[in-house]
């Protein structure tokens, strides 16, 4: 019997093992020099002046919203087609999430939906670069500038993604994820990039107890002594063990993403003979990171529901994912916003399915998936 094929698997090798050993041998395993190396390397990738490594992208979103002063009564616009952590952070700060619809075919938040949701209480806009493709940043930043509203890019899916020749994040502030299924991973982790030095300083303080110094001081070889708390903060710093793995992964990013793109191209070719509908690509110039390959399973077209397809693939030893069940349909948000309807988000939320896609996926793995899809479709 064939081994179970997961929908994602991290691409780890000798380089990551060596990186971990180096940190263990150094005697300094928590936040230290590897964090600074990672931040500098990520700035070279995105073109930003500052990067702040954190324990997760969720942590990064939390302190980014705090650094903007988001609080009681404020509104933050974001799509419902996202992971709920963004909504949770908004709510936990006492603010109100304003969830908007997305384009039916790309699942990207549109500037039209954003602008329609802007009120005098709007204090931030959070577009999501979905599945590895970029949102329409020119139009979204134009809205931010017109109304004086900061934009924070949710780039959890977008390490390696470019929009009109520039890496995601280069326009301002963006938050990336190093979670286990992401394009590069260190098990858990994230990074915030920005060109605003005051904003970066706030992030560094908030991620480490609100202290007026970073978690690591290059000159003293540790944390500066007698540091004072400037404001209450959190314990969101990234250990060097994780940072070292992320660095090793970052050095492989081009190769990892090239393999993802090759598999995605094979999927697109194979879908021509199947009833399942992949997402459309954005019309603007971009480089897709192919974090996810998503199909829509419409029962009227496919003869099967999404949930039944996922269950059938599981019986054949093939894993899938759901990215995402729309946030406003989750119990807490459904009860808090009982009248909210987002037609294109809801249509997709009931039909989307993420197929296996990861750099170490073999040709035989790919053939298994396509053969199974043909069998399920009755072909």
From Swiss-Prot:
It catalyses: UDP-4-amino-4-deoxy-beta-L-arabinose + 2-oxoglutarate = UDP-beta-L-threo-pentopyranos-4-ulose + L-glutamate. GO terms for molecular function: pyridoxal phosphate binding; UDP-4-amino-4-deoxy-L-arabinose aminotransferase. GO terms for cellular component: membrane. Belongs to the DegT/DnrJ/EryC1 family. ArnB subfamily. Pfam families: DegT_DnrJ_EryC1. HAMAP family: ArnB_transfer. Homodimer. This is UDP-4-amino-4-deoxy-L-arabinose--oxoglutarate aminotransferase. The keyword NADP does not apply. It comes from Salmonella paratyphi A (strain AKU_12601). GO terms for biological process: lipid A biosynthetic process; lipopolysaccharide biosynthetic process; response to antibiotic. Keywords: Aminotransferase, Antibiotic resistance, Lipid A biosynthesis, Lipid biosynthesis, Lipid metabolism, Lipopolysaccharide biosynthesis, Pyridoxal phosphate, Transferase. CDD domains: AHBA_syn. Its cofactor is pyridoxal 5'-phosphate. It is an enzyme of class 2 (transferase). Pathway: Nucleotide-sugar biosynthesis; UDP-4-deoxy-4-formamido-beta-L-arabinose biosynthesis; UDP-4-deoxy-4-formamido-beta-L-arabinose from UDP-alpha-D-glucuronate: step 2/3; Bacterial outer membrane biogenesis; lipopolysaccharide biosynthesis. The modification N6-(pyridoxal phosphate)lysine is found at residue 182. Its EC number is 2.6.1.87.
């Amino acid at each position: 019997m064939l081994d179970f094929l997961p929908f994602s698997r991290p691409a780890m090798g000798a380089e990551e093992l060596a990186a971990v050993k180096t940190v263990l041998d150094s005697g300094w395993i928590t936040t230290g020099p590897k964090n600074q190396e990672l931040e500098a390397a990520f700035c070279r990738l995105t073109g930003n002046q500052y990067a702040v490594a954190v324990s997760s992208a969720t942590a990064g979103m939390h302190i980014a919203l705090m650094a903007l002063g988001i609080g009681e009564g404020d509104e933050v616009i974001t799509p419902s087609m996202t992971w709920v952590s963004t909504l949770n952070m908004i709510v936990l700060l006492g603010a109100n999430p304003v969830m908007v619809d997305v384009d039916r075919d790309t699942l990207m938040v549109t500037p039209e939906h954003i602008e329609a949701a802007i009120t005098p209480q709007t204090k931030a806009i959070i577009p999501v670069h979905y599945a590895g493709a970029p949102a329409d940043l020119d139009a979204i930043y134009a809205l931010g500038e017109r109304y004086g509203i900061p934009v924070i890019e949710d780039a959890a899916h977008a390490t390696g993604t470019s929009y009109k020749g520039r890496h995601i994040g280069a326009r301002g502030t963006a938050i990336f994820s190093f979670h286990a299924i992401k394009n590069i991973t260190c098990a858990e982790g994230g990074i915030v990039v920005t060109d605003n030095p005051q904003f970066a300083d706030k992030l560094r303080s908030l991620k480490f107890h609100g202290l007026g110094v970073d978690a690591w001081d290059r000159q003293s070889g540790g944390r500066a002594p007698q540091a004072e708390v400037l404001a209450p903060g959190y314990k969101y710093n990234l250990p060097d063990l994780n940072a070292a793995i992320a660095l090793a992964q970052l050095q492989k990013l081009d190769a990892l993403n090239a393999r993802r793109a090759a598999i995605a191209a094979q999927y697109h070719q194979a879908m021509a003979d199947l009833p399942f509908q992949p997402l459309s690509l954005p019309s603007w110039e971009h480089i897709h990171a192919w974090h996810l390959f998503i199909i829509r399973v419409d029962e009227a077209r496919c003869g099967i529901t999404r949930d039944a397809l996922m269950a059938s693939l599981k019986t054949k030893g093939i894993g899938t994912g759901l990215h995402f069940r729309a946030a406003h349909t989750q119990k807490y948000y459904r009860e808090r916003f009982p009248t909210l309807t987002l037609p294109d988000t809801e249509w997709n939320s009931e039909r989307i399915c993420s197929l296996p896609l990861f750099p170490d996926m073999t040709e035989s793995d790919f053939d298994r998936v396509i053969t199974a899809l043909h069998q399920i479709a009755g072909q």
